[in-house]
Amino acid sequence: MKKPIRVIFSDLDGTLFYGGPAKCTMTKENENAIQRWTAAGNRFIIATGRPSSIRDELMERHQIECDILACNGAKVILDNQVLWSKEVGPEQIREIMNLCEPYGDKVDFALDMDWTEWVVLRRHGFVEENYGGAIFNTTVEQYISVPREMYPNKIFMVCADMEIKMRLMSELSEHFEGRLEVTSSGQDNIELGCPGVGKDIAVKEILNLLNLDESQAAAIGDEVNDLSMLQCIPFGFVMSSAREEIKQQVPREIGSVHQLIDWCLEYNNN
């Protein structure tokens, strides 16, 4: 007997934010659809590479109810409770700095964590250039020079071009094999997180905690770091706007989050 879909996992950048009226905002169609979905007693879970603090911003700005799978699964908040938070330690951060050193100003990275300011490798680098609205008062060197209560759930790295990205990504994967997960959420970036962390792993653990089958979840995304999530359940959808090499790896395709929600509601009603 068919079971209804009860939870939707949605990527943010390039997915939920696709077509929004301003940077980091969603369309009114997506907002209304999420409200309809949760009003029907279902869950909407943000599945993103971003820190978990984005959840509160979305709930306030768009009047939606949601949980979050943050930093590619390194931190999960469900029903306002932190289920887990896995951090990259200072020793590993130092190793990353050393591997980036030969690239000079062609590579920059930030520590992804719920903090009021961004911690960056270099001032006035690529991260600051691309995210000028954020606050940049502390460098990575300054941050790891003294013991801290909080370390990042993920490292977000920006490269000058695709060639550098692919070369460095290969070096990082080889150096940290078994110690850090290396992935990407865009053509110019690299993301590093704790081993055994991934959107797919977090999705399966959340479904287990909610006593839901894999067939009772749907997911949507558009990038490399979404692929494991889209491929681990029957109803994984890739955004029509995604790059061809991403779309080729996911059998189901759809145009937007609100279209997926409509699809799920129709599926449940038939």
Residue ranges of model-derived segments:
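A short, Lys/Arg-enriched amphipathic alpha-helix followed by its capping loop at the start of a domain
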Residues: K2-I8, N32-N42, H175-F176
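Mg2+-dependent phosphoryl-transfer enzymes with acidic/Ser/Thr/Gly-rich catalytic loops
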Residues: K3-V7, T27, E191-N270
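Asp-based phosphoryl-transfer active-site loop
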Residues: P4-A22, L230
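Short, well-ordered alpha-helix to beta-strand connector turns
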Residues: I5, G41, E65, P152-N153, ...
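Active-site phosphate-binding/coordination module
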Residues: T27-V127
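Hydrophobic beta-strand scaffold residues
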Residues: F44, V107-F109, V182, G236, ...
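Short hydrophobic/aromatic-enriched beta-strand-loop microsegments
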Residues: E65-N72, K86, E129-G132, G236-S241, ...
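Conserved acidic, metal-coordinating active-site core of Asp-based
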Residues: K106-I220, S228, C232, S241
